[in-house]
């Protein structure tokens, strides 16, 4: 007979750390916190670092960041390094086999070789970007632990699909076969109950094999809760956005506890151009990451498949053409002056000059991106 924890205890429903998870962590489970540089994972890491210290949990606490390459927002890695240093939490950076853009390119080439006329971009129904670029590298890393909890910053408020997620469940891809959640467990409640039973089974076996959980500690948090844990508020973020839009970039960004992309107007921070992003965030991402926009828009033009169904990045070419070179340079100078972005080391620049052809280096200037934007505009098919 498996021991049952207080799954339906009302006080437990309101707590970020349920009685079951508390028990697991008190028994020495290592805690790996998945971070992206976004506000939710920032808040989760801040909260859990405090909980880990105050509860004297004996397992290791660490942060995991899966770097997706040049599609990341400028300064994400710098931000996470500062945050983890501030919280005294070790940060492990993981890298997928291919960066996100390289994965799209490979899939496009594979479909061409097979003469299959299919979209190659990831989408809501084909989220291989999450599976291949984040989950698989994380699982590979986590297999070094025999008893581990991986915390992920999903919130129910974000979507109906996320609202249906369990607070915790067995991490099937790395847990030993005896503890994997059966396919018959469909609901969040069933998956949570199974996790509790599987944990007791693991204890009864003398801790045989690997026991691993996925946990959503801020599942019930509101946006207000997230900003508050990060040391700011919805009102302060709105004030900073107004300053940024008025051109007062330094005052807008200075002392902001999260990544500057929120101050620039983004509502979420994922990839700088995300297939699941809103129209607003796509436009803002393109304006602030014109190099990435140019590369992806050219992939659209040459492949014939739009980045999002019915929405082309190439259609934003007029907006990207209007990007002010002065504003882009000012932004980078501000980020560097506030120590939010490291300047490339001179030795790195010299090495780049030695190994890269001049024509490749020229691509990464803002002037060349504007020229490419003009070309993309000309290549767009005329509306019928």
Regions found by a protein language model. Give the residues of each.
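Nucleotide-activated chemistry modules centered on ATP-dependent adenylation/adenylyltransferase
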Residues: 1-34, 39-384
């Amino acid at each position: 007979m498996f021991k049952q924890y207080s799954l339906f205890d009302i006080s437990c429903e309101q707590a970020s750390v349920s009685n079951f998870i508390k028990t697991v962590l008190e028994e020495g489970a290592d805690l790996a916190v998945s971070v992206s540089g976004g506000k939710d994972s920032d808040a989760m890491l801040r909260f859990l670092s405090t909980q880990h210290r105050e509860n004297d949990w004996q397992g290791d606490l660490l942060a995991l960041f899966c770097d997706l390459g040049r599609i990341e927002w400028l300064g994400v890695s710098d931000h996470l390094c500062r945050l983890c240093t501030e919280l005294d939490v070790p940060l492990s950076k993981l890298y997928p086999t291919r960066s996100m853009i390289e994965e799209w390119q490979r899939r496009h080439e594979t479909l061409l070789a097979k003469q299959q006329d299919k979209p190659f971009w990831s989408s809501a129904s084909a989220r291989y970007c999450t599976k291949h670029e984040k989950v698989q590298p994380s699982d590979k890393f986590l297999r070094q632990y025999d008893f581990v909890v991986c915390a992920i910053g999903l919130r129910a408020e974000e979507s109906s699909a996320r609202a249906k997620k369990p607070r915790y469940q067995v991490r099937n891809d790395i847990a030993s076969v005896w503890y994997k959640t059966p396919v018959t467990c469909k609901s969040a409640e069933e998956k949570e109950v199974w996790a509790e039973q599987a944990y007791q089974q693991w204890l009864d076996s003398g801790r045989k094999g690997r026991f691993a959980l996925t946990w959503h500690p801020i599942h019930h948090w509101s946006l207000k809760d997230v900003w508050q844990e990060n040391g700011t508020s919805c009102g302060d973020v709105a004030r900073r956005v107004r300053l940024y839009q008025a051109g007062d970039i330094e005052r807008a960004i200075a002392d902001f506890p999260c990544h500057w992309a929120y101050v620039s107007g983004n509502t979420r921070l994922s990839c700088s151009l995300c297939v699941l992003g809103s129209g607003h965030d796509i436009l803002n991402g393109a304006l602030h990451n014109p190099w990435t926009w140019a590369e992806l828009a050219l992939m659209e033009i040459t492949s014939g498949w739009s980045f999002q169904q019915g929405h082309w990045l190439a259609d934003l070419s007029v907006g990207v053409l209007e990007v002010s070179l002065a504003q882009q340079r000012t932004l980078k100078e501000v980020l560097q002056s506030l120590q939010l972005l490291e300047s490339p080391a001179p030795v790195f620049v010299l090495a780049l000059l030695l190994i890269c052809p001049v024509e490749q280096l020229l691509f990464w200037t803002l002037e060349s991106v504007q020229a490419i934007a003009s070309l993309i505009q000309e290549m767009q098919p005329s509306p019928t």
